A protein has these predicted regions:
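Lipid interaction determinants
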Residues: 3-6, 21-147
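Bacterial N-terminal signal peptides
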Residues: 8-17
Length: 147
């Protein structure tokens, strides 16, 4: 009896270890855009060079896509809201309205709004939200708070 119990406990322990290892690799591929409020990590600049702008960590730009078809967030200076049309992993932002505060450096804000205008699909890769146009990544976000 002790041998059977020990064998069962060993198998359960082994399965737990295997399960923990496979889940720690992260999720690569498509995922749920509604899981979090997302904080901007980087965004492509609005320049011919397509340089990458790194977000200011002091006041993070945010994005939140809601299941009712709305989007809201902050560019780190101004707040915005609008609509989002989702069809699978294809999406289109539209009717974006925002406050019009005068910002010290509007480089990231201009790139952020350009990204919203250009995005046509998304991927969630290892917990990061990637907004893309075709296969080109326009912006990367990290979850700020999971729901």
């Amino acid at each position: 009896m002790k041998t059977n119990l020990l064998a069962i406990l060993s198998i359960i322990g082994l399965l737990s270890i295997i399960s923990a290892c496979s889940s720690s690799k992260g999720h690569q591929g498509k995922g749920n855009i509604f899981e979090s409020e997302w904080g901007l990590v980087s965004v492509k600049a609005v320049t011919p060079t397509d340089s990458l702008l790194i977000a200011n960590n002091d006041n993070t730009a945010t994005l939140e896509v809601l299941s009712d078809g709305t989007v809201k967030g902050s560019t780190s200076c101004n707040i915005f809201e609008g609509q989002v049309a989702l069809n699978g992993y294809n999406l289109k932002f539209g009717n974006i309205v925002s406050t019009q505060l005068s910002c010290y450096d509007s480089t990231v804000e201009a790139a952020f709004y350009s990204m919203l205008d250009s995005t046509d699909n998304y991927t969630v890769d290892h917990g990061h939200l990637l907004l893309k146009k075709g296969n080109k990544v326009l912006a990367q976000f990290t979850p700020l708070n999971m729901r």
